[in-house]
């Protein structure tokens, strides 16, 4: 049974995922285009958000929030970066989203919540991203 604190953690995680999936990434490159200084990259802030949420909260909370996010995007609302529906299941982007499940488990295994410092956060984040990309190669 979920208590109120776990429910709040899940809702905060879900809210963070939905908001960051809609935020585009811009890189200022003033020497390429004279008219506009920003170039939009076709990525979102989902992976850094998943990493940060997994480092802060427990694995179960982030897995539940991410599962709700997937269900919302496939069946209810277009919360993914490029929309969403049942047809999104057949796109490569959905496979990339499914690759975030091992990322959550790997980060939680690497994370030691007794001592928290920036160096461990960065090291565990980069190790988890590398492991996620290696797991996507073998899927």
What residues fall within each predicted segment?
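Membrane-embedded alpha-helical segments of transport systems
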Residues: 71-76, 129-135
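Short helix-perturbing small/polar motifs within transmembrane alpha-helices
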Residues: 3-23, 85-134
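Conserved small/polar residues in nucleotide/adenosyl-binding loops
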Residues: 137-139
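Interfacial aromatic-anchored transmembrane helix boundaries in multi-pass membrane proteins
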Residues: 21-40, 68-103
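Alpha-helical transmembrane segments and their helix-entry boundary regions
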Residues: 62-66, 121
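Hydrophobic transmembrane alpha-helices
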Residues: 1-63
């Amino acid at each position: 049974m979920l208590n109120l604190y776990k429910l709040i953690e899940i809702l905060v995680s879900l809210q963070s995922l939905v908001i960051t999936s809609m935020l585009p990434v811009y890189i200022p490159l003033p020497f390429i285009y004279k008219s506009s200084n920003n170039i939009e990259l076709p990525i979102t802030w989902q992976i850094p958000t998943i990493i940060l949420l997994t480092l802060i909260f427990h694995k179960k909370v982030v897995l539940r929030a991410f599962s709700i996010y997937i269900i919302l995007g496939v069946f209810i609302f277009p919360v993914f970066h490029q929309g969403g529906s049942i047809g999104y299941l057949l796109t490569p982007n959905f496979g990339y989203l499914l690759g975030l499940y091992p990322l959550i488990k790997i980060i939680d295994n690497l994370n030691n919540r007794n001592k928290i410092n920036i160096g461990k956060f960065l090291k565990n984040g980069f190790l988890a991203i590398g492991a996620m990309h290696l797991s996507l190669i073998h899927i």
